[in-house]
Amino acid sequence: ITYLKVTTAETPYLIREPEEVVMTQEQETAFINNCLNSDRSLMLIATLDGKHIGNCSFNPVGNYKRYRHRCEVAIALYQEFCGYGIGKIMLETVLKAAKESGFEQAELEVISDNQNAIALYEKLGFQKYGTFPDNMKYADEHYASADWMMKKL
């Protein structure tokens, strides 16, 4: 929970504000246990010296048969650890596991001006397939668009 509060505070690219991280320890534990007990979801945790520094996950897109081939991918990493290849390793691992779980395509949403993330996603084979204008509205009243990206597994 502390990790979520820190990552949401240090970057404008995540969907929540720090004060919106309101889950209890029990709720977070239940969420993690659901990931551990599912063959259709994965949460990969990156640690350094026993401290949580990042995570990467995949989850099904809905629970419909016609969507069974699709998964959503998400990643977050403390800013101080960006640029060292940790995110790339986590994404490669998660994408491999998603394919092994039977998914045929991975999807994600990224803020359009997050060029470092977009460059990484493109390096891993993701392609942009659309833009959602004014996807997020910040406290200072400005908006950010988001790109939708997809990769065949």
List where the protein language model places each region.
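Conserved catalytic-core motifs of GNAT/GCN5-like acyltransferases
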Residues: P60, E107-V110, E122-H142
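Conserved GNAT acetyl-CoA-binding A-motif
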Residues: L91, A98-E109
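Structural preference for long, well-ordered alpha-helical segments within the folded cores
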Residues: I89, T93, A97, A119-K123
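C-terminal "cap" of GNAT-fold acetyltransferases
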Residues: C71, I111-I118, D134-L153
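A short, well-structured alpha-helix characteristic of acyl/acetyltransferase catalytic modules
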Residues: I1-V22
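Acetyl-CoA-dependent GNAT
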Residues: T8, E20-E80, L91-E92, K152-L153
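Conserved beta-strand segments that form the floor/walls of ligand-binding pockets within enzyme
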Residues: I45, S57, E72-A76, G85, ...
